[in-house]
Amino acid sequence: MGRGKIEIKRIENTTNRQVTFCKRRNGLLKKAYELSVLCDAEVALIVFSSRGRLYEYANNSVKSTVERYKKANSDTSNSGTVAEVNAQHYQQESSKLRQQISSLQNANSRTIVGDSINTMSLRDLKQVENRLEKGIAKIRARKNELLYAEVEYMQKREVELQNDNMYLRSKVVENERGQQPLNMMGAASTSEYDHMVNNPYDSRNFLQVNIMQQPQHYAHQLQPTTLQLGQQPAFN
């Protein structure tokens, strides 16, 4: 079973209050020590009991820590709030870090181009050579990767263009096949029109031919009658 929650209030029993004070004081001193060691912090702890007894802990010195606190407090009151002081401190630290980074970059660039190799030892030169070889290997690997990607893209693009070309050719063939019947109908209409223009229709000639020419069976019927009228009757 876990412990129940302890209500935070003044302990009325004197003995219990003294026992609790000793336990909590020792725990507080232990935490202050751990904080100073683990985090490299300057810690000063001052505790007065209810009877006026002093208990203190400091990883450096309580007096020096208090003096530092007074100075920081006075500087803060003169220069501004704590947030402003922290901001100034961080700006200074960042400026120092930027300068260090810039100097390291300049040193590396001089090393790469070979400007500062005259002052290097054999061991340093071997280290620089190994770094350069690793860098060149990474550059070549990245270069080959980009080239392969570009070749793959061009191959896909070629296939797409070929498919588009085949599609356009099929459309052209379909259009040509659809226009062939229309061309044949247009040619027939043109020949009929030319025949009508070259041989115009004349209704008078048509009537003359019909009037002057009698049907052959009708002329055959009239011929015996004409012969009978021109002959004398024979008397026996």
UniProtKB/Swiss-Prot annotation:
It comes from the Eukaryota. Its main location: nucleus. Signal peptide: none annotated. One of its GO terms (molecular function) is DNA-binding transcription factor activity, RNA polymerase II-specific. Keywords: Activator, Developmental protein, Differentiation, DNA-binding, Flowering, Nucleus, Transcription, Transcription regulation. Expressed in lemmas, paleas and lodicules. It is found in: Nucleus. GO terms for cellular component: nucleus. Residues 1-61 form the MADS-box domain. One of its GO terms (biological process) is regulation of transcription by RNA polymerase II. Disruption phenotype: Homeotic transformation of stamens into lodicules, and ectopic development of lodicules where they do not form in the wild-type. It holds the Pfam family K-box. SMART domains: MADS (SM00432). Residues 87-178 form the K-box domain. The transformation of lodicules into stamens is observed in overexpressing plants. Probable transcription factor involved in the development of floral organs. Acts as C-class protein in association with MADS58. Involved in the control of lodicule number (whorl 2), stamen specification (whorl 3) and floral meristem determinacy (whorl 4), but not in the regulation of carpel morphogenesis. Plays a more predominant role in controlling lodicule development and in specifying stamen identity than MADS58. PANTHER family: SERUM RESPONSE FACTOR HOMOLOG. This is MADS-box transcription factor 3. It comes from Oryza sativa subsp. japonica (Rice). The gene is MADS3.
